[in-house]
Amino acid sequence: MSGSRRITVAVGVLMFVDASLYLAVLPLLPHYVHRFDLSTLGAGVVIAAYPVSVPVVSIGCIALVPRLGARRITLASAALMTVATVIFAWAPSALVLVLARFVQGLASGSIWTASMAWVTENAPLGHRGRESGIVTGMLSAGSVMGPAIGALAGWAGQGIAFGLVAVVALLGVLLSYRAPAGRDAVASGRVWDGLVASARQPATGAALAIAVVDLLAFGAVDLLVPLRLGSLGHSVAQIGIALAIGAVLGAAVGPLAGRLVDRLGAPVVGSSAAACTVVIPLVLALEPSAAVQFGVLVAGGPLFAIVGAAMFPLSSAGADAAGVSHVTATGLMGAVWAGGFTIVPLLVGTLAQAASTQAAYVVILLLCLPAFILLRRRVRIIPRLAAADAGPGT
């Protein structure tokens, strides 16, 4: 196995753990409410403790990766996630549970930023899409396992279920240790200057626009569609099966989407995926049948895999064009992504409660449209990414 592929596999395993930990807690919320006497707000704190720190960590990694190296930060993050998962598994109180989940989120932020930069900095020339697709495919596989881990924890106990996740996280530590350091990220001067320089590039702007469309649409879908299906009498198991099918499809589509990105270009693939995503809130605002809403849940997995396969090569191409390290672009992406997935469910929930579900979808659609228009404008002026991808890594 080549050095670059060892990096990709190591990061993919950590992304698998990250996705499974984020989603595993959802089926367990009723258990935590009963065991720790939590209010609805307290249950919300358990969920929010994971992503709340990611934007700050992502920006911090931009300064730290050039100094310490992406591999070292990945190793430290993987070790931190392993320890936090063990503590989470046997948390004796709600406070320990929330703190352990907060630490898992700290590790998640640096994995998304430093580790993805490690992948794109060292991907073979012309194959960033392929390597990014492999990672997002493994992320989708983690999304499959998350609800299953939660179900196992409810049946066999948290110690066994999350202990198994900790073992996989430890495997990620070992794989990261054995992977080569690869190219070192070059310091880009002041963090803010690097962020601005990267954000001004058309490719980075396109990547950010794709991310915004995705997090707006699926931030709404993740909250409102399961609630709607539940109100129509469909079981948790049926909803979980639909999500699992989507995640399985995402795991299969990820590598294929990466190869498509390398062949057709990230702008073409990314803008096509974003166009499909923009349609989703429009369709859901029309109150379609349950079958259509189940279809949306299934479509989420492969659509996310395609988005990820295009988004990371776009952001790294923008970093190359700006003359900054890839971690600058991935840090910016991570901050936007995590911030969006923290804010959007709160916004959508407030709108749905104050007005209606249809009104919430209409607002999301209206927010998606400017991002999609910006994407189309950026795509028109992006130089052919194959040329950017073939350039020297920074």
Go through each PLM region and give its residues.
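Juxtamembrane intracellular "pre-TM" segments in multi-pass secondary transporters
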Residues: 1-4, 179-207
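Helix-breaking motifs and short loop linkers at transmembrane-helix boundaries and internal kinks
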Residues: 37, 69, 90-95, 233, ...
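Intracellular juxtamembrane helix-capping segments at the cytosolic ends
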Residues: 111-123, 307-321
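Conserved MFS/SLC helix-loop-helix module at the cytosolic interface between two early adjacent transmembrane helices
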Residues: 56-92, 261-264
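Helix-loop-helix hairpin linking two adjacent transmembrane segments in secondary transporters
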Residues: 134-177
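Cytoplasmic helix-loop-helix junction between adjacent transmembrane helices
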Residues: 100-139
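Paired small-residue
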Residues: 84, 95-103, 291-300
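C-terminal membrane-cytosol helix-exit motif in multi-pass small-molecule transporters
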Residues: 166-185, 372-379
